[in-house]
UniProtKB/Swiss-Prot annotation:
One of its GO terms (biological process) is wound healing. This is UPF0598 protein CG30010. It comes from Drosophila melanogaster. InterPro entries: DUF4505. It comes from the Eukaryota. Belongs to the UPF0598 family. Disulfide bonds: none annotated. GO terms for cellular component: mitochondrion. It holds the Pfam family DUF4505.
Length: 167
């Protein structure tokens, strides 16, 4: 969910929900390489002359639901439904063994990684297989196929979480 930084109450009633705005905002989201506020705000969304500096607990992209779009499976992010989606790559789901969070590839301009919302991660976790003990899962059962998880992509991502539990 997207909030103003100084919002006192951060819940669904106080977040931005207008899908056209979310599309505009997230399509301009990038790593902050402006030399301004980089340590406090590692992401930026340039909206015309306005600079929106962004910080987040974990990743700026949070996948909120799994959908079908034009006969293709996609993950939607930012609670924007069909407006903001990326192709679903089930073989690239990654569960971090340190915190149990599930991640999926995102656009390179935001660091290449997005967090899977807890509710969706719980649904997906039913399909994980752990052949290496309690470490990250090694396989994923999806649509009748047993997929070997490919987690190498995580090594090439950038995350700047503000929450210590997410590091």
């Amino acid at each position: 969910m997207l909030f103003l930084d100084d919002a006192k109450m951060k819940n669904f009633t106080s977040c931005f929900k207008e899908k056209d705005f979310l599309k505009f905002f997230f399509n301009r989201l990038r790593l902050n390489k402006t030399s301004r506020y980089e340590s406090e705000f590692p992401y930026i969304s340039l909206c015309g002359r306005e600079r929106n500096f962004i910080r987040c607990d974990d990743t700026p992209v949070v996948f909120t639901e799994q959908l079908r779009k034009d006969d293709t499976e996609v993950l939607s992010y930012a609670h924007a439904g069909q407006v903001l989606t990326l192709p679903y790559e089930p073989h690239k789901l990654y569960m971090d063994p340190r915190n149990g969070r599930v991640y999926h590839p995102a656009a390179p301009q935001v660091g290449g990684i997005g967090l899977v919302r807890s509710k969706l991660a719980i649904e997906l976790s039913q399909h994980f297989e752990f052949l290496a003990g309690e470490a990250s899962p090694t396989h994923f059962q999806w649509n009748g196929e047993r997929l070997e998880l490919q987690n190498e992509w995580v090594n090439n991502t950038q995350r700047f979480p503000m929450n210590e539990d997410c590091k």
